[in-house]
Amino acid sequence: MGLNSHAPTGPIEQAWDKHKFELKLINPANKRKYNIIVVGSGLAGGAAAASLGELGYNVQCFCYQDSPRRAHSIAAQGGINAAKNYHNDGDSIFRLFYDTVKGGDFRSREANVYRLAQVSVNIIDQCVAQGVPFAREYGGLLDNRSFGGAQVSRTFYARGQTGQQLLLGAYQALERQIGLGTVTMNERTEMLDLIVVDGQARGIVTRDLCDGKIEVHIGDAVVLATGGYGNVFYLSTNAKGCNATAIWRAYKRGALFANPCFTQIHPTCIPVAGEYQSKLTLMSESLRNDGRIWVPKTPGDKRPPASIPEDERDYYLERRYPSFGNLVPRDIASRAAKAECDSGRGVGETGLGVYLDFSEAIKRLGKQKIAERYGNLFEMYERITGENPYEVPMRIYPAI
């Protein structure tokens, strides 16, 4: 079986518009005759079910949690990118497309990335309409900040709780459609198998997690929005419920993995504290906006960070990548941090960590401004490690 993405061909700027125009449309009065199954109720699944229901389709949404609000999307922190160019710093749909492809080490499927950049502008408007409280500037306009892999400010955020606020917005839209009768919600239900007819997914087999009842659900289309498979790695920030079983069952029915190693690696996780610890805590990528990453220049230097003078510190990302500084793409920052630790310059008891220092940003902007941006993240870090990041540098290490 060959891998066929069914991505449109031709000049990339016109490919999707041409593809959409050539698709067969469904009359609004006929949409209620179609049944769509959505497996998963996080940001992707919940938003898809709500949007499809609002368009007029009959939707059945399934999740194994007690409520869609229990989805792991709540763990996303830093923000969501969109090419709105509010800061007038040269951003555009093509620049977002280019930065995303480059940040993916040129392994991404370019047609899909371009479509993502195209719809990013509308996604922000949809989120605002759903009531997502994005941060705003003093004049009331939506604020932006920078993220890794970009030289423009295009990230819309809600402090360090962007995923939670986006999920609440999608959940409210989903509940509205449930109330209107276009979406039927099936909680505490696990997908056991995918039903494939002539190469197309036409339904699922489910098990009720309360009474064990097994049922078959048939539809005209199936949307799998069940999250990633990061828990196949030992060190992971994913919840234990992110078990990748739906992906595996789709694979057994003939779905192909285009690039199984293409998982998201975060360079800003709290390092392991014990030999048998596998569940890690993610700190937001947005921290790299104001935090400076460094290690001691001398391998094996175990002095407290405050005792290491400035000329004995190596701000290795700023040294190697002056154009991006600490905002290099995640895989580059992760590889660089691991290389420093492997060379013996890692910090902390285990040596698996680098410093993320906010002392300069606090001097420049003031403690109150830093607290406004990252206060909840600093509180979470102190609760887990017992260290105050306003006074001592954070310690971070890459993880899935």
What are these regions (language model features)?
Residues 53-77:
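Glycine-rich FAD pyrophosphate-binding loop
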Residues 34-61:
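N-terminal Rossmann-like FAD-binding beta1-loop-alpha1 element of flavoenzymes
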Residues 249, 256-392:
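An anion/pyrophosphate-binding glycine-rich loop and adjacent beta-alpha core
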Residues 1-36, 54:
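Extreme N-terminal leader/targeting segments of oxidoreductases
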Residues 186-188, 192-207, 373-400:
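A glycine-rich dinucleotide-binding beta-alpha-beta segment and adjacent secondary-structure elements
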Residues 31-34, 210-221:
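Core beta-strand elements of the Rossmann-like FAD/NAD(P) dinucleotide-binding domain
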Residues 128-213, 225, 269-280:
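Conserved redox-cofactor binding core of oxidoreductases
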Residues 81-116:
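Glycine-rich active-site loop/strand segments that organize a redox cofactor
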